[in-house]
C-alpha cells in the first residue's frame, strides 16, 4: 500500500529507556497506590512493528510480578496494515533483540525451531495481553472505544505539522 511506502517504521525494543524507567518508577508506583486490583490500560499510538508494545508488556509484567492482583492490556495502533500484521505475528530477528537484557530474552522470547532463521517470537503470555488495530490520525473523526491510563504517542506525532499535532 502507498502508506507503507511513505511512512517511517523506525522502532526498537527498549528505545529511549528513560521513558520505561519513568513508567515503572513513577506511573506504575502511583497507579498501585491509587487503584486496588484492576487492569492497567496502555495505548501505543504509531506502534509500527510492535517493538514498543512488547517492550511495554515486558516492563509492566515485570512490575506487576511484585504487585499481585493487577492485570494489564496494551493496544497498539498504526496506519500501516502490514506493520500491524507484523506486530500480531510478534516474530523478530536476533539482531532486533540484541540489546535486550539477557534475563528478559530468556523469559519472554522463544527461539525458532529452525536455527538458521535466527528469529525469535514473543511468548504467548505477553502476546495475549497485546491487541493491534488500524488507526489513521488524519481521519477527521477517530474514536477510541476505551480509556487508557497511559498513552505512548512519542514516535508518531513528531512527523505532523504543529496544527495537526494540536488536533491529535
Regions found by a protein language model. Give the residues of each.
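Extended basic-aromatic, gly/pro-enriched interface segments that bind polyanionic ligands
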Residues: 66, 70-152, 156-164
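N-terminal "domain-start" segment that seeds a small globular fold
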Residues: 14-29, 54, 127-138
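Conserved AdoMet
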Residues: 1-43
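A short glycine-rich, Lys/Arg-flanked "PGG" loop and its adjoining helix->strand segment in the class I
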Residues: 166-168
